[in-house]
Structure formats: C-alpha cells, structure tokens
C-alpha cells in the first residue's frame, strides 16, 4: 500500500532581546546556573510581569517579513501544565489572539521548483528552564536562567509532505530570522529548535491520520533522520493492522529511533485563560508602518536582485546569503570597489573563506576589514598587481597588515607593464623553447599557457599576464 506523509512544524525561535519577556533578567547564554533569574522567573508569589516592548517589535517584524496579518489586538494567556523547570505551574503564552496570523514563506526545491508554505500563526511566549541531569549523580538540578526568555513560536499548517520540504522550509526560516536580526539561529545553544507533527494516510486520501509530535529537535540532520524513522514506524504500525497512538516522542540520535515521552495533550488539557496580570496589547497601524519602513534587506529580495547579475551563479548567491554578516561584507565591498562581481565573490568564497574556516573565524569579525579588502580588489581590477602577487599580499593582510601600497613598495611587487622589457622576455622564452614553439605552431595551442607561465616565472609574478599573452601571440604568429 502507498502512503502520503503529512508534516506540520512548530519552530521556537529565541528572540535576541537583552532582557527576558516579563522581567529585567539577562538573556545571555552560558552564565552560571540560576545567576540570571528574577523573582518572576522563579515564580515567587506577589510578583508581577512587565512586558518587554522589544519582543513585540520583533514579532511584528517577523509578521511583516512573512506577509502575515498583524492583529491589532493580541492577548497573553496562561498555559497550565506541570513540569519541574516551570516553577509557576503555567507558561505565559498566546492562544486565541496571537500577534501574527496567516503568513507564508516561499521555499526552493529541486529542479527550480518553488513551494509556498503557509504559516498559520506566530505568537510570543516565555521559555521554560532547564533540567540538568548530568550535573549531579543522585538528583536532577534545575537551571532557571532560560526561564522567561522570549520565544517566537512559528506554526505552519500541515502542508509539508516530505523530509526534503521540511528541511528546506526550516533552512529558509532560519535564514530569515537571522537576516531580520531577531534570532541568532544558534541551534547548538537551543536558540532555534523545532517540534515536528507527523502523520501518514493512504495515498490520495483527504482524511489525515493520527499524528505524533517529535519534540525539541535542534539539528537539521537530526530532524531529517527523525522524520524518516517516524514515517517508517507509522507505516509498520498501520500495515500490521494496529493504530498509531497520539503521543509526544523524543528522537534519540545515538540509535536513530524515537521513544515515547508522554501522551499528546490537546488544547483543552492546558486550560488556557487570559493572564489577569497582563493587559491586552493594542497595536496601531502607524506603529506597524514605521516598523515596515525600517525592515532590513531580506533574503528573498536580495536573491532576486543577485540573480539579475549574469556573472553570479546559484552557488555564488547561496554563499553571499549564507549569513547576514557575509552579505553585509560583500555589500560593503561592492560599494567601495569597481571590481567585477565575479572577482569579488571568487576571492570571498575561495581564499578568504578557506582562511576563515582554518582559523575558526567568520565574517562577523573578519581579519581584513571590508574597506581594506575593497582596496586590495581594486588593485587587482586596475591590473596593478598580478594574481600570483595578489595571493602573497592577501596572506600578509590576513596577518594584520593594512597598508597595501606599503606592502607593494616594500616587497617590490609593482607590476611590470613596460612593453619593451616584456617583449624582450618573450623573445628569450621563444628562443629557449624551440621544440614547444614548433608544437604550438602545429596546432597545440594549449602550450600558450606554458609560455605565459615561463614569463611569470622569470618576472617573479610581476609581469602583466594579459600583456604577455598578447606579445606571445604576436611573436608566435
């Protein structure tokens, strides 16, 4: 029997606010356990939450970026459940009146296909704390540093039908929140994590099957493997004549299986009701318009613009959009340098990216400023240095040198453009290699590169290769 897989995703993106959603405690990652915990985070009686305005602004930014509806009235509600790292006994979230509804995100699939993923809602809620199972041998510790950190929960409709579609959507969303500057996207630190709701149904059927939820996946590779395992598990159960149980499961990467965690709750189990300590949020159109006018450049628009640059291919564009810092670095160089787009991107994704990877650096803190890199590429564009000399200069720039003209003067890297001197070198090479000259004239034109190489060798890389090329063709006939 053939089956269709149906997937809906819930992504929790930690917002990059300096303080928590309802308290002034810091959101910085990696602090000593419980050192960034306020009375509100600890759930002590008599304390009242105060809403972080910046979190509201970030949620609106996201809603605009996904072409969603920004609701003028939004309400915080209490989601009631017990868990050791939730000291209040409830989570402040949004249910009936979220900030954002009815958005979409376009994703790219293979063979130049595009799919629109419908986003049902995006709402604000506070994160829970952490259970520390490895810190002590005889009991579990609780760290409330994360408790109260603002989350934007982004929920799709069940409109994804394969692991490939799910991963492409998640990567596109991950890219978007980073370019918006609302989330750092650090999956290892839990800043961007995903719950997968999955079911299967007979092929072509309009009736959805019983779903299971896979919780807190924080790696694209693990998400893909978890979906594949859960698809196969559902299929085995149904083809054995049994029924899938609606439950929450955890993925175990050590043995590539999912394990039951608890029965899957319905909304009624959480007994949502408006939080009496928080007033409804009224968002006026003028505020939304102001936020819209200040949105940064976003990946979809940048990609369309870059695709109008004939010299850039998909690989080049993907590199430029690999992070906001990479894009900003490329954009700054473009504004300062007359070099061709292809020249810029070849240096950035080639020798520069290799150096960054080798030294565990990124374009967030580049060893060469965009201004210096633009000046360097301008020298290449103006043919003041050859490509072989450029590599030597680049290595020096990576070690902290900044004055390119001083390097050229000190090392004697001035390019030789004297036509008569270069012509003399070409004549010497032709006399030195008569056998190769004969072969070239007989039709072995690839030998031209050999002659150019000899000229560059004799001039220690200082000759203008284009001039050498023209002179060789002139003398070889």
UniProtKB/Swiss-Prot annotation:
GO terms for biological process: glutaminyl-tRNAGln biosynthesis via transamidation; translation. It comes from the Bacteria. Its EC number is 6.3.5.-. Gene3D superfamilies: 1.10.10.410. Keywords: ATP-binding, Ligase, Nucleotide-binding, Protein biosynthesis. One of its GO terms (molecular function) is asparaginyl-tRNA synthase (glutamine-hydrolyzing) activity. Heterotrimer of A, B and C subunits. Allows the formation of correctly charged Asn-tRNA(Asn) or Gln-tRNA(Gln) through the transamidation of misacylated Asp-tRNA(Asn) or Glu-tRNA(Gln) in organisms which lack either or both of asparaginyl-tRNA or glutaminyl-tRNA synthetases. The reaction takes place in the presence of glutamine and ATP through an activated phospho-Asp-tRNA(Asn) or phospho-Glu-tRNA(Gln). PANTHER family: GLUTAMYL-TRNA GLN AMIDOTRANSFERASE SUBUNIT B MITOCHONDRIAL AND PROKARYOTIC PET112-RELATED, GLUTAMYL-TRNA(GLN) AMIDOTRANSFERASE SUBUNIT B, MITOCHONDRIAL. Belongs to the GatB/GatE family. GatB subfamily. This is Aspartyl/glutamyl-tRNA(Asn/Gln) amidotransferase subunit B. The gene is gatB.
């Amino acid at each position: 029997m053939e089956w269709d897989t149906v997937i809906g995703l819930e992504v929790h993106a930690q917002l990059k606010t300096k303080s928590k959603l309802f308290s002034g405690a810091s959101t910085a990652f990696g602090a000593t356990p419980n050192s960034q915990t306020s009375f509100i985070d600890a759930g002590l009686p008599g304390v009242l939450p105060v809403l972080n305005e910046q979190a509201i602004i970030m949620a609106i930014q996201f809603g605009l970026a996904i072409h969603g509806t920004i609701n003028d009235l939004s309400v915080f509600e209490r989601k009631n459940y017990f868990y050791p790292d939730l000291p209040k006994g409830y989570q402040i979230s949004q249910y009936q009146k979220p900030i954002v509804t009815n958005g979409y995100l376009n994703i790219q699939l293979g063979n130049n296909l595009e799919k629109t993923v419908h986003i049902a809602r995006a709402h604000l809620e506070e994160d829970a704390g952490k259970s520390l199972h490895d810190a002590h041998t005889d009991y579990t510790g609780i760290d409330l540093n994360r408790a109260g950190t603002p989350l934007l929960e982004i929920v799709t409709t069940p409109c994804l039908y394969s692991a490939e579609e799910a991963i492409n959507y998640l990567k596109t969303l991950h890219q978007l929140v980073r370019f918006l500057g609302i989330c750092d996207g650090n999956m290892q630190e839990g800043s961007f994590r995903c719950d997968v709701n999955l079911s299967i149904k007979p092929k072509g059927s309009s009736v959805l099957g019983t779903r299971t939820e896979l919780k807190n996946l924080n790696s694209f590779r693990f998400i893909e493997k978890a979906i594949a395992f859960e698809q196969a598990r559902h299929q085995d159960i149904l083809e054995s004549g049994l029924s899938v149980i609606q439950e929450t499961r955890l993925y175990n990467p050590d043995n590539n299986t999912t394990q039951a965690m608890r029965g899957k709750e319905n909304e009624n189990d959480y007994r949502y009701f408006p939080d009496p300590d928080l007033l409804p949020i009224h968002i006026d159109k003028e505020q939304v318009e102001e936020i819209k006018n200040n949105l940064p450049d976003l990946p979809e628009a940048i990609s369309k613009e870059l695709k109008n640059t004939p010299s850039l291919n998909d690989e080049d564009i993907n590199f430029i959009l690999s992070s906001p810092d990479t894009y900003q670095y490329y954009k700054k160089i473009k504004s300062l340098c007359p070099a061709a787009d292809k020249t810029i991107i070849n240096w950035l994704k080639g020798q520069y990216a290799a150096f960054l990877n080798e030294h565990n650096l990124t374009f967030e803190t580049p060893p060469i400023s965009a201004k210096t890199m633009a000046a360097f590429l301008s020298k290449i564009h103006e043919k003041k240095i050859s490509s072989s000399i450029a590599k030597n200069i680049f290595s020096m720039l990576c070690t902290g040198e900044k004055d390119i003209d001083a390097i050229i003067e000190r090392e004697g890297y001035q390019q030789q453009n004297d036509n008569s001197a270069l012509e003399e070198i070409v004549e010497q090479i032709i006399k030195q290699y008569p056998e190769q000259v004969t072969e070239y004239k007989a039709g072995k034109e690839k030998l031209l590169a050999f002659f150019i190489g000899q000229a560059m060798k004799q001039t220690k890389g200082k000759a203008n290769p284009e001039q050498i090329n023209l002179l060789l063709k002139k003398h070889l006939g």
